[in-house]
Design a protein with these regions (language model features):
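Solvent-exposed interaction patches of small proteins and small membrane subunits
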Residues: 1-10, 14-21
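Alpha-helical structural motif
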Residues: 7, 14, 110-114, 278, ...
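Non-catalytic, regulatory and substrate/membrane-recognition segments associated with hydrolase enzymes
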Residues: 15-16, 20-32, 39-40
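Low-complexity, highly charged intrinsically disordered N-terminal segments
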Residues: 36-135, 139-143
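Acyl-donor binding region in acyl/amide transferases
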Residues: 102-125, 131-289
Length: 399
């Protein structure tokens, strides 16, 4: 019996015949094959994404992108693995009552290598971020091992739920989006992930220390294109869940105040499912046919530009732009760092009134609210062996 995917390809070719000697048709076949491999199916003559209400289906959409990223990193990964792996704890090295987190800014090649290696561990590949970027490692001072990592970067320009929560008009947003950063990487690594370390990392991203480092890093700096020097007041973080509704950020409160506030969901459109080795082909094709969108990249337009690139390519290839609808509705969170964050971002107040959120106070709250109760009822972390996350082994197994 023939593979179901082969039968689907036959049906698709009958709908839109493919000349394999034409570059456009070869690219069209490549894109369709990639979608089929990620779980898209043919319904009433249309390719539709897998059911996004099932988190396993969502993970399947990411499988090929993650595999591609591992393969791209192969030679680098093998060159650094033995250097970075000892900085991941074995379960026996974790003393729950003596954990003490320390924040470290990524400012060296070794730290960058450790950050990159750790981010490749997750089942959902992480973005490289856009524009301004600040990356952090979170260490356990007691044993010198890595707890987790996070990164802040420029936020996307178009995010309706965020803009509605703030109460932004276009002119206010253009003027004050500078004071917002997006947490595009946020999570813990094992064995700390077993101990709800992701909640700790999320809280630390909102700490006074991070906000103060932002102010120091961007003080007296002119913006890239407008050459405007602004006071670097970081008053709001945003982030989105990877797999629909988030259990990590929901109910993440400190002393009765909700730190991460859910403001809605994305609409399930994007280009990530065209990023698994095909985006460069898309860009090369558009450049070859002279589509002006290739040259339209501008500051702040990173993800939107990629979206437009893929959309234009689909149209040129005779495919529906609806293929950009992957169906994954990510939950959107805002993290106000000041009690008057919304008024400040609307231009109604000139100085932010910051919450007091020192790192050590946040950890003490996390320790008693989540860490110690979790460690008492779930001892899986104790059996963790860092060799189980050796990525070169996974790379060899996946070919």
């Amino acid at each position: 019996m023939r593979d179901p995917k082969e039968r689907l390809r036959d049906i698709l070719e009958a709908i839109a015949p493919i000349d394999r000697y034409r570059r456009s048709d070869r690219l069209r076949q490549t894109l369709l094959d990639a979608l089929l491999q990620q779980g898209f199916t043919l319904v009433n003559g249309q390719l539709v994404p897998p059911d996004p209400s099932c988190k396993d289906n969502i993970r399947q959409l990411y499988v090929h992108l993650r595999k591609e990223k591992l393969q791209e990193a192969g030679s680098w990964l093998r060159s650094v693995e033995d250097k970075v792996l000892p900085y991941f704890a074995n379960g026996a090295e974790v003393n729950v009552r003596r954990i003490h987190p320390v924040l470290e800014f990524v400012d060296s090649q070794f730290k960058a290598d450790l950050f990159r290696y750790a981010s490749l561990l997750w089942s959902v590949p992480v973005s490289a971020g856009y524009g301004r970027r600040m990356r952090f490692l979170v260490w356990d001072e007691y044993n010198g091992k890595l707890i987790g990592l996070f990164a802040l970067g420029d936020p996307v320009y178009n995010l309706r739920a965020r803009d509605q929560w703030i109460g932004w008009g276009a002119s206010d947003k253009n003027e004050r989006l500078y004071h917002v950063m997006d947490a595009y990487v946020l999570g813990a690594v094992p064995p700390y992930s077993y101990l709800l370390g992701g909640k700790l990392v999320a809280l630390l991203a909102a700490s006074d220390e991070v906000r103060e480092m932002f102010q120091k890093r961007y003080a007296r700096q002119a913006s890239v294109f407008r050459k405007v020097v602004r006071e670097p007041h970081l008053v709001l973080l945003t982030t989105t869940s990877a797999l629909g509704r988030s259990s990590l950020y929901n109910r993440l409160s400190v002393s009765g105040r909700r730190v991460f506030i859910s403001v809605g969901f994305t609409e399930g459109w994007g280009h990530f499912h065209f990023s698994n080795g095909t985006f460069e082909q898309v860009k090369a094709y558009l450049r070859e046919i002279g589509d002006p969108v290739v040259k339209q990249y501008k500051y702040g337009g990173g993800p939107n530009w990629r979206f437009r690139m893929v959309k234009r390519c689909l149209i040129h290839l005779g495919l529906s732009p609806d293929l950009l609808h992957h169906g994954i509705k990510r939950e959107i969170f805002v993290v106000p760092l000041a009690s008057n964050a919304r008024a400040f971002l609307r231009g109604e107040e000139t100085e932010p009134v910051y919450y007091e959120m020192p790192k050590d106070s946040l950890f003490e709250y996390f320790k008693h609210r989540w860490l110690l109760p979790r460690a008492a009822r779930d001892q899986r972390y104790q059996a963790f062996n860092r060799e189980s996350i050796r990525l070169s082994r996974r790379l060899n197994e996946e070919g």
